[in-house]
From Swiss-Prot:
Gene Ontology cellular-component annotations: plasma membrane
NCBIfam families: yihY_not_rbn (TIGR00765)
Organism: Verminephrobacter eiseniae (strain EF01-2)
Domain of life, per lineage: Bacteria
Annotated TM spans: 54-74, 111-131, 151-171, 192-212, 226-246, 261-281
Alphabetical keyword list: Cell inner membrane, Cell membrane, Membrane, Transmembrane, Transmembrane helix
Membrane topology type: Multi-pass membrane protein
Protein name stated in the entry: UPF0761 membrane protein Veis_3782
InterPro entries assigned: UPF0761_bac (IPR023679), Virul_fac_BrkB (IPR017039)
Cellular location(s): Cell inner membrane
Similarity comment: Belongs to the UPF0761 family.
Xref: Pfam families: Virul_fac_BrkB
Length: 417
Protein backbone atom coordinates (compact mmCIF):
# COMPACT_ATOMS: atom_id res chain seq x y z
CA UNK A 1 0.00 0.00 0.00
CA UNK A 2 2.93 2.29 0.47
CA UNK A 3 3.78 2.37 -3.24
CA UNK A 4 0.39 3.70 -4.43
CA UNK A 5 0.46 6.17 -1.56
CA UNK A 6 3.92 7.40 -2.59
CA UNK A 7 2.82 7.70 -6.20
CA UNK A 8 -0.25 9.69 -5.22
CA UNK A 9 1.84 12.05 -3.07
CA UNK A 10 4.33 12.52 -5.91
CA UNK A 11 1.48 13.15 -8.36
CA UNK A 12 -0.03 15.80 -6.09
CA UNK A 13 3.33 17.51 -5.68
CA UNK A 14 3.93 17.52 -9.42
CA UNK A 15 0.44 18.89 -9.96
CA UNK A 16 1.08 21.63 -7.39
CA UNK A 17 4.40 22.48 -9.04
CA UNK A 18 2.80 22.71 -12.46
CA UNK A 19 0.09 24.91 -10.98
CA UNK A 20 2.70 27.24 -9.48
CA UNK A 21 4.54 27.41 -12.80
CA UNK A 22 1.32 28.19 -14.65
CA UNK A 23 0.54 31.04 -12.23
CA UNK A 24 4.05 32.48 -12.32
CA UNK A 25 4.12 35.90 -14.06
CA UNK A 26 6.32 34.86 -16.97
CA UNK A 27 5.30 37.81 -19.14
CA UNK A 28 5.95 40.33 -16.37
CA UNK A 29 9.31 38.69 -15.68
CA UNK A 30 10.33 39.01 -19.33
CA UNK A 31 9.24 42.66 -19.33
CA UNK A 32 11.21 43.31 -16.13
CA UNK A 33 14.34 41.71 -17.58
CA UNK A 34 14.03 43.82 -20.72
CA UNK A 35 13.40 47.04 -18.78
CA UNK A 36 16.26 46.47 -16.32
CA UNK A 37 18.65 45.42 -19.10
CA UNK A 38 18.00 48.71 -20.87
CA UNK A 39 17.63 51.05 -17.89
CA UNK A 40 20.61 49.69 -15.92
CA UNK A 41 22.81 49.44 -19.04
CA UNK A 42 23.56 45.79 -18.29
CA UNK A 43 24.91 45.23 -21.80
CA UNK A 44 27.55 47.90 -21.23
CA UNK A 45 28.27 46.49 -17.77
CA UNK A 46 28.73 43.01 -19.26
CA UNK A 47 31.20 44.47 -21.77
CA UNK A 48 33.18 46.09 -18.96
CA UNK A 49 33.18 42.86 -16.96
CA UNK A 50 34.30 40.94 -20.06
CA UNK A 51 37.34 43.20 -20.45
CA UNK A 52 38.17 42.95 -16.74
CA UNK A 53 37.70 39.17 -16.85
CA UNK A 54 40.19 38.79 -19.70
CA UNK A 55 42.74 40.72 -17.64
CA UNK A 56 41.96 38.74 -14.48
CA UNK A 57 41.83 35.21 -15.94
CA UNK A 58 45.56 34.60 -15.63
CA UNK A 59 45.79 36.11 -12.09
CA UNK A 60 42.86 33.96 -10.94
CA UNK A 61 44.37 30.86 -12.45
CA UNK A 62 47.78 31.70 -11.01
CA UNK A 63 46.37 32.09 -7.50
CA UNK A 64 44.45 28.82 -7.83
CA UNK A 65 47.53 26.95 -9.05
CA UNK A 66 49.58 28.51 -6.26
CA UNK A 67 47.11 27.16 -3.71
CA UNK A 68 47.25 23.66 -5.18
CA UNK A 69 51.05 23.80 -5.56
CA UNK A 70 51.47 24.82 -1.93
CA UNK A 71 49.62 21.64 -0.91
CA UNK A 72 50.74 18.77 -3.20
CA UNK A 73 48.21 16.47 -1.56
CA UNK A 74 45.51 18.42 -3.42
CA UNK A 75 46.87 17.51 -6.85
CA UNK A 76 43.85 15.29 -7.59
CA UNK A 77 41.56 18.16 -6.64
CA UNK A 78 43.30 20.36 -9.20
CA UNK A 79 42.70 17.80 -11.95
CA UNK A 80 39.03 17.51 -10.98
CA UNK A 81 38.60 21.29 -10.95
CA UNK A 82 40.25 21.69 -14.36
CA UNK A 83 38.04 18.96 -15.78
CA UNK A 84 34.93 20.67 -14.43
CA UNK A 85 36.00 24.02 -15.89
CA UNK A 86 36.47 22.40 -19.29
CA UNK A 87 33.13 20.59 -19.30
CA UNK A 88 30.90 23.09 -17.50
CA UNK A 89 31.89 26.72 -17.96
CA UNK A 90 33.35 26.89 -21.47
CA UNK A 91 31.99 25.53 -24.76
CA UNK A 92 33.71 22.33 -25.91
CA UNK A 93 34.99 23.93 -29.12
CA UNK A 94 37.44 26.17 -27.23
CA UNK A 95 37.60 24.62 -23.75
CA UNK A 96 40.83 22.66 -24.02
CA UNK A 97 42.65 25.39 -25.92
CA UNK A 98 41.67 27.98 -23.30
CA UNK A 99 42.69 25.68 -20.46
CA UNK A 100 46.03 24.99 -22.15
CA UNK A 101 46.74 28.68 -22.63
CA UNK A 102 45.77 29.52 -19.06
CA UNK A 103 47.96 26.77 -17.64
CA UNK A 104 50.88 27.95 -19.77
CA UNK A 105 50.44 31.61 -18.81
CA UNK A 106 49.91 30.80 -15.14
CA UNK A 107 53.06 28.66 -15.07
CA UNK A 108 55.07 31.59 -16.41
CA UNK A 109 53.34 34.03 -14.06
CA UNK A 110 54.29 31.87 -11.09
CA UNK A 111 57.91 32.80 -11.77
CA UNK A 112 57.26 36.48 -11.18
CA UNK A 113 58.65 38.27 -8.19
CA UNK A 114 56.68 39.73 -5.34
CA UNK A 115 55.96 42.98 -7.18
CA UNK A 116 54.70 41.21 -10.30
CA UNK A 117 52.57 38.80 -8.32
CA UNK A 118 51.09 41.74 -6.38
CA UNK A 119 50.01 43.35 -9.66
CA UNK A 120 48.29 40.12 -10.70
CA UNK A 121 46.58 39.89 -7.33
CA UNK A 122 45.34 43.49 -7.56
CA UNK A 123 43.92 42.72 -11.02
CA UNK A 124 42.03 39.71 -9.65
CA UNK A 125 40.67 41.74 -6.73
CA UNK A 126 39.63 44.52 -9.14
CA UNK A 127 37.36 42.08 -10.95
CA UNK A 128 35.82 40.90 -7.69
CA UNK A 129 35.22 44.45 -6.46
CA UNK A 130 33.65 45.30 -9.83
CA UNK A 131 31.26 42.36 -9.45
CA UNK A 132 30.50 43.51 -5.90
CA UNK A 133 29.64 47.04 -7.01
CA UNK A 134 27.59 45.83 -10.00
CA UNK A 135 25.42 43.46 -7.95
CA UNK A 136 24.86 46.08 -5.26
CA UNK A 137 23.77 48.52 -7.97
CA UNK A 138 21.21 45.99 -9.22
CA UNK A 139 19.85 45.68 -5.66
CA UNK A 140 19.89 49.51 -5.34
CA UNK A 141 22.23 49.29 -2.34
CA UNK A 142 23.65 52.71 -1.47
CA UNK A 143 26.01 51.70 1.34
CA UNK A 144 28.64 49.08 0.53
CA UNK A 145 30.54 47.01 3.04
CA UNK A 146 33.86 48.47 4.24
CA UNK A 147 36.65 47.93 1.70
CA UNK A 148 38.81 45.95 4.12
CA UNK A 149 35.96 43.58 4.94
CA UNK A 150 35.21 43.02 1.26
CA UNK A 151 38.85 42.34 0.41
CA UNK A 152 39.21 39.81 3.25
CA UNK A 153 36.01 37.98 2.30
CA UNK A 154 36.90 37.78 -1.38
CA UNK A 155 40.50 36.82 -0.71
CA UNK A 156 39.19 33.88 1.28
CA UNK A 157 36.89 33.04 -1.63
CA UNK A 158 39.82 33.14 -4.09
CA UNK A 159 42.01 30.84 -2.00
CA UNK A 160 39.52 28.45 -0.40
CA UNK A 161 36.96 28.35 -3.22
CA UNK A 162 39.09 26.26 -5.63
CA UNK A 163 39.94 23.80 -2.84
CA UNK A 164 36.34 23.26 -1.76
CA UNK A 165 35.06 23.02 -5.32
CA UNK A 166 37.84 20.64 -6.32
CA UNK A 167 37.21 18.50 -3.23
CA UNK A 168 33.51 18.07 -4.03
CA UNK A 169 34.22 17.22 -7.65
CA UNK A 170 37.05 14.82 -6.77
CA UNK A 171 34.83 13.06 -4.23
CA UNK A 172 32.18 12.46 -6.86
CA UNK A 173 34.79 11.23 -9.33
CA UNK A 174 36.13 8.87 -6.67
CA UNK A 175 32.65 7.47 -5.98
CA UNK A 176 32.09 6.95 -9.68
CA UNK A 177 35.43 5.15 -10.18
CA UNK A 178 35.48 3.18 -6.91
CA UNK A 179 32.02 1.75 -7.48
CA UNK A 180 33.45 -0.79 -9.93
CA UNK A 181 30.70 -0.15 -12.45
CA UNK A 182 27.95 -0.18 -9.84
CA UNK A 183 27.00 3.41 -10.63
CA UNK A 184 26.26 2.44 -14.20
CA UNK A 185 23.76 -0.14 -12.95
CA UNK A 186 21.98 2.26 -10.60
CA UNK A 187 18.44 3.40 -11.39
CA UNK A 188 18.10 6.15 -13.95
CA UNK A 189 17.02 8.62 -11.27
CA UNK A 190 20.24 8.14 -9.27
CA UNK A 191 22.39 8.33 -12.40
CA UNK A 192 20.60 11.53 -13.29
CA UNK A 193 21.62 12.97 -9.91
CA UNK A 194 25.28 12.22 -10.63
CA UNK A 195 24.99 13.69 -14.12
CA UNK A 196 23.38 16.82 -12.67
CA UNK A 197 26.26 17.56 -10.30
CA UNK A 198 27.91 20.08 -12.61
CA UNK A 199 24.61 21.86 -13.11
CA UNK A 200 23.94 22.04 -9.36
CA UNK A 201 27.50 23.16 -8.53
CA UNK A 202 27.10 26.12 -10.87
CA UNK A 203 23.62 26.90 -9.52
CA UNK A 204 24.89 26.71 -5.94
CA UNK A 205 27.80 29.02 -6.73
CA UNK A 206 25.46 31.60 -8.23
CA UNK A 207 23.07 31.27 -5.29
CA UNK A 208 25.94 31.95 -2.88
CA UNK A 209 26.96 34.96 -4.97
CA UNK A 210 23.45 36.44 -4.98
CA UNK A 211 22.87 35.74 -1.29
CA UNK A 212 26.10 37.07 0.21
CA UNK A 213 27.44 39.78 -2.13
CA UNK A 214 24.59 42.35 -2.01
CA UNK A 215 24.75 44.33 1.22
CA UNK A 216 21.05 43.76 1.82
CA UNK A 217 18.97 40.77 2.97
CA UNK A 218 18.40 38.25 0.16
CA UNK A 219 16.31 35.16 0.90
CA UNK A 220 17.78 31.80 0.03
CA UNK A 221 14.85 30.70 -2.11
CA UNK A 222 15.21 33.82 -4.24
CA UNK A 223 18.99 33.32 -4.53
CA UNK A 224 18.47 29.70 -5.56
CA UNK A 225 15.93 30.76 -8.17
CA UNK A 226 18.50 33.10 -9.69
CA UNK A 227 21.20 30.42 -9.49
CA UNK A 228 19.04 27.84 -11.27
CA UNK A 229 18.13 30.44 -13.90
CA UNK A 230 21.83 31.09 -14.57
CA UNK A 231 22.77 27.40 -14.67
CA UNK A 232 19.95 26.61 -17.11
CA UNK A 233 20.74 29.58 -19.36
CA UNK A 234 24.47 28.75 -19.35
CA UNK A 235 23.72 25.22 -20.55
CA UNK A 236 21.40 26.52 -23.27
CA UNK A 237 23.93 29.18 -24.31
CA UNK A 238 26.72 26.59 -24.54
CA UNK A 239 24.64 24.39 -26.81
CA UNK A 240 23.50 27.37 -28.91
CA UNK A 241 27.05 28.67 -29.35
CA UNK A 242 28.36 25.20 -30.19
CA UNK A 243 25.57 24.75 -32.75
CA UNK A 244 26.30 28.15 -34.30
CA UNK A 245 30.04 27.53 -34.51
CA UNK A 246 29.41 24.12 -36.06
CA UNK A 247 26.95 25.41 -38.67
CA UNK A 248 28.55 28.81 -39.35
CA UNK A 249 32.34 28.54 -38.89
CA UNK A 250 32.87 32.26 -39.52
CA UNK A 251 35.44 32.78 -36.78
CA UNK A 252 37.53 29.78 -37.83
CA UNK A 253 37.55 30.87 -41.48
CA UNK A 254 38.40 34.52 -40.77
CA UNK A 255 40.75 34.20 -37.79
CA UNK A 256 42.21 30.76 -38.39
CA UNK A 257 44.40 29.67 -35.49
CA UNK A 258 43.45 32.82 -33.54
CA UNK A 259 39.73 32.02 -33.59
CA UNK A 260 39.84 30.98 -29.93
CA UNK A 261 40.24 34.58 -28.72
CA UNK A 262 37.12 36.16 -30.34
CA UNK A 263 35.06 33.08 -29.50
CA UNK A 264 36.21 33.33 -25.88
CA UNK A 265 35.30 37.04 -25.80
CA UNK A 266 31.82 36.32 -27.16
CA UNK A 267 31.33 33.52 -24.64
CA UNK A 268 32.48 35.57 -21.64
CA UNK A 269 30.15 38.40 -22.69
CA UNK A 270 27.22 35.99 -23.00
CA UNK A 271 28.04 34.46 -19.62
CA UNK A 272 28.14 37.85 -17.89
CA UNK A 273 24.84 38.90 -19.47
CA UNK A 274 23.29 35.72 -18.09
CA UNK A 275 24.80 36.28 -14.62
CA UNK A 276 23.51 39.87 -14.52
CA UNK A 277 20.05 38.80 -15.67
CA UNK A 278 20.10 36.14 -12.96
CA UNK A 279 20.81 38.90 -10.45
CA UNK A 280 17.82 40.85 -11.78
CA UNK A 281 15.62 37.76 -11.40
CA UNK A 282 16.80 37.30 -7.81
CA UNK A 283 16.41 40.96 -6.90
CA UNK A 284 12.96 41.44 -8.44
CA UNK A 285 11.48 38.03 -7.65
CA UNK A 286 9.72 39.26 -4.46
CA UNK A 287 7.90 42.00 -6.36
CA UNK A 288 7.12 39.67 -9.28
CA UNK A 289 5.53 37.13 -6.95
CA UNK A 290 3.66 39.85 -5.07
CA UNK A 291 2.20 41.24 -8.28
CA UNK A 292 3.55 44.78 -8.04
CA UNK A 293 1.16 47.17 -9.75
CA UNK A 294 3.03 50.48 -9.40
CA UNK A 295 6.30 51.01 -11.23
CA UNK A 296 6.83 54.70 -10.50
CA UNK A 297 7.76 56.31 -13.80
CA UNK A 298 6.27 59.76 -13.12
CA UNK A 299 8.26 62.79 -11.99
CA UNK A 300 8.39 63.22 -8.23
CA UNK A 301 7.75 59.52 -7.64
CA UNK A 302 10.44 59.16 -4.98
CA UNK A 303 9.02 62.08 -3.01
CA UNK A 304 5.49 60.67 -3.30
CA UNK A 305 6.72 57.28 -2.10
CA UNK A 306 8.47 58.89 0.87
CA UNK A 307 5.22 60.58 1.92
CA UNK A 308 3.34 57.29 1.62
CA UNK A 309 5.97 55.54 3.76
CA UNK A 310 5.59 58.24 6.43
CA UNK A 311 1.82 57.82 6.31
CA UNK A 312 2.06 54.04 6.79
CA UNK A 313 4.55 54.33 9.66
CA UNK A 314 2.41 57.02 11.29
CA UNK A 315 -0.62 54.75 11.03
CA UNK A 316 1.05 51.92 12.99
CA UNK A 317 3.06 54.06 15.43
CA UNK A 318 1.01 52.85 18.42
CA UNK A 319 0.70 49.20 17.35
CA UNK A 320 2.38 46.44 19.32
CA UNK A 321 4.35 45.32 16.26
CA UNK A 322 6.73 48.28 16.54
CA UNK A 323 6.88 49.50 12.97
CA UNK A 324 6.94 47.73 9.62
CA UNK A 325 9.50 45.75 7.64
CA UNK A 326 10.51 46.89 4.17
CA UNK A 327 8.67 43.91 2.69
CA UNK A 328 5.48 44.85 4.54
CA UNK A 329 5.73 48.44 3.35
CA UNK A 330 6.24 47.27 -0.22
CA UNK A 331 3.17 45.03 0.01
CA UNK A 332 1.01 47.80 1.48
CA UNK A 333 2.12 50.34 -1.13
CA UNK A 334 2.10 47.80 -4.00
CA UNK A 335 5.65 48.68 -5.02
CA UNK A 336 8.95 46.87 -5.38
CA UNK A 337 11.15 46.61 -2.30
CA UNK A 338 14.05 47.90 -4.39
CA UNK A 339 12.13 51.13 -4.99
CA UNK A 340 11.84 51.59 -1.23
CA UNK A 341 15.56 51.22 -0.48
CA UNK A 342 16.64 54.78 -1.47
CA UNK A 343 13.51 56.24 0.12
CA UNK A 344 14.11 54.52 3.46
CA UNK A 345 17.78 55.52 3.38
CA UNK A 346 16.82 59.17 2.77
CA UNK A 347 14.31 59.15 5.62
CA UNK A 348 16.85 57.46 7.89
CA UNK A 349 19.50 60.05 6.97
CA UNK A 350 17.06 62.80 8.04
CA UNK A 351 16.54 60.98 11.38
CA UNK A 352 12.83 60.84 10.67
CA UNK A 353 12.80 57.03 10.50
CA UNK A 354 14.83 54.51 12.48
CA UNK A 355 15.53 50.78 12.43
CA UNK A 356 14.72 48.60 15.42
CA UNK A 357 14.88 44.92 16.43
CA UNK A 358 15.60 42.92 13.31
CA UNK A 359 13.03 40.16 12.78
CA UNK A 360 13.86 36.68 11.48
CA UNK A 361 11.20 35.93 8.87
CA UNK A 362 12.58 32.46 8.07
CA UNK A 363 15.24 30.46 9.88
CA UNK A 364 17.46 30.25 6.78
CA UNK A 365 17.10 33.92 5.85
CA UNK A 366 18.89 36.98 7.28
CA UNK A 367 16.93 39.07 9.79
CA UNK A 368 14.99 42.05 8.48
CA UNK A 369 14.86 45.29 10.51
CA UNK A 370 11.62 47.10 11.28
CA UNK A 371 11.24 50.78 10.46
CA UNK A 372 9.55 53.13 12.92
CA UNK A 373 8.65 56.81 12.77
CA UNK A 374 10.95 58.87 15.01
CA UNK A 375 10.03 62.43 14.06
CA UNK A 376 7.19 64.36 15.68
CA UNK A 377 4.76 65.24 12.87
CA UNK A 378 3.50 68.35 14.70
CA UNK A 379 6.92 69.99 15.00
CA UNK A 380 8.83 68.67 11.97
CA UNK A 381 9.00 70.84 8.86
CA UNK A 382 8.67 69.06 5.53
CA UNK A 383 11.24 71.34 3.88
CA UNK A 384 14.28 68.99 4.27
CA UNK A 385 12.45 66.16 2.50
CA UNK A 386 11.25 68.46 -0.31
CA UNK A 387 14.79 69.74 -0.73
CA UNK A 388 16.27 66.22 -0.74
CA UNK A 389 13.85 64.34 -3.00
CA UNK A 390 11.77 66.85 -4.95
CA UNK A 391 13.04 70.38 -5.50
CA UNK A 392 16.11 72.21 -4.30
CA UNK A 393 15.63 75.75 -3.09
CA UNK A 394 17.57 78.18 -5.27
CA UNK A 395 17.40 81.86 -6.09
CA UNK A 396 15.31 81.29 -9.21
CA UNK A 397 12.90 79.00 -7.34
CA UNK A 398 12.59 81.25 -4.29
CA UNK A 399 9.26 82.84 -5.38
CA UNK A 400 7.77 79.39 -6.02
CA UNK A 401 8.82 78.19 -2.57
CA UNK A 402 7.39 81.28 -0.90
CA UNK A 403 4.06 81.33 -2.75
CA UNK A 404 3.53 77.56 -2.39
CA UNK A 405 4.44 77.71 1.27
CA UNK A 406 6.81 74.75 0.94
CA UNK A 407 9.02 76.12 3.70
CA UNK A 408 6.09 76.29 6.15
CA UNK A 409 4.59 72.84 5.57
CA UNK A 410 4.82 70.43 8.47
CA UNK A 411 4.84 66.65 8.33
CA UNK A 412 1.43 66.56 10.00
CA UNK A 413 -0.03 68.44 7.01
CA UNK A 414 0.60 65.53 4.65
CA UNK A 415 -0.26 62.64 6.95
CA UNK A 416 -3.63 60.93 6.79
CA UNK A 417 -6.09 62.27 9.33
Amino acid sequence: MSLPFSLSVAARRIEALLGDLSRFPWKTTAQTLRERFRADHLGLTASSLTFTTILALVPFFTVALAVFTAFPIFGQLQDALQGWLVSSLVPDSIARQVLGYLTQFAAKASGLGLAGFSVLLVTALALILTIDRTLNDIWRVQRLRPLGQRVLIYWAAITLGPLLLGASLALTSYVMSASGGLVKRLPDGVRFLFDSLQFMVLAAGMALLYHYVPNTPVRWRHAWSGGLFVALCIELAKKALALYLGRVPTYSVVYGAFATLPILLVWIYMAWVIVLLGAVVTAYLPSLLAGVARRGTVAGWTFQLALEVLQQLHRVRHDAGKGLRAGQLAQLLRVDVLQLEPVLESLTALDWVGQVSAVVVAASDPPEPRYVLLADPQSTLLEPLVHKLLLERSESLGPLWDKAGLGRLQMADVLAR
